[in-house]
Amino acid sequence: MSQLKYILDIEGTVCPISFVKDTLYPFFLKQVESLVKTNDPTLQNLLAQFPVPQDASSLHEHIESLVNNDIKDSVLKQLQGYIWEQGYKSGEIKAPVYPDAIDFIQRHAPNVYIYSSGSVKAQILLFQHVEGDIDLTKSIAGYFDINTSGKKTEPQSYTNILKSIGVPPSSASDVVFISDNDKELDAALDVGISTILALRPGNNPVSNAEKYKALNNFSSI
């Protein structure tokens, strides 16, 4: 049998699902007022992609609405990545990755990949700044997001990832996707990828959880 490759979701899988909504989102929202008044050309170009009037008030309202409704918007994700970078670099943000997930990622390097709706930039920052001054990026082979691969609930996204990591469709079952979201697992299953449901404290209940192989700790793999 071929060496297994693992694709990991982030929140609710390798770190608490509360990290994004209780730490990252509030940190970002505190910066929105200054963000919409920025003179940085890169940020201005991103803001210009929002389908609203470009005055500060309209932009502020639109961004807050996207965040509060947890809309997976690619422009928003890029802006968040920029703001979170400042927080990680200043030490204000540290990622609470589960110890068993840290051990798993290190043990299975270089066969671990990350797939999240957050931007690749934000993913790298998270794994560079893990609590305990741990940098996991050297153990992770690659990162995928909605810009590089597509939405996590669409089978085509997983076909795209298989191609990116050099796995032919006939060997898809040698890839294991671990997530707390059953819709994402179903999309991966549709293209033959093996799946595991992550059952972490605080995760949203999955009505048909018995349908999936499941774990509450990576040490069980």
Curated annotation (Swiss-Prot):
Binds 1 Mg(2+) ion per subunit. One of its GO terms (biological process) is L-methionine salvage from methylthioadenosine. It catalyses: 5-methylsulfanyl-2,3-dioxopentyl phosphate + H2O = 1,2-dihydroxy-5-(methylsulfanyl)pent-1-en-3-one + phosphate. Its EC number is 3.1.3.77. InterPro entries: Enolase-ppase_E1, ENOPH1_eukaryotes, HAD-like_sf, HAD-SF_hydro_IA, HAD_sf. The keyword Cytoplasm applies. It is found in: Cytoplasm; Nucleus. Belongs to the HAD-like hydrolase superfamily. MasA/MtnC family. Monomer. This is Enolase-phosphatase E1. It comes from Kluyveromyces lactis (strain ATCC 8585 / CBS 2359 / DSM 70799 / NBRC 1267 / NRRL Y-1140 / WM37).
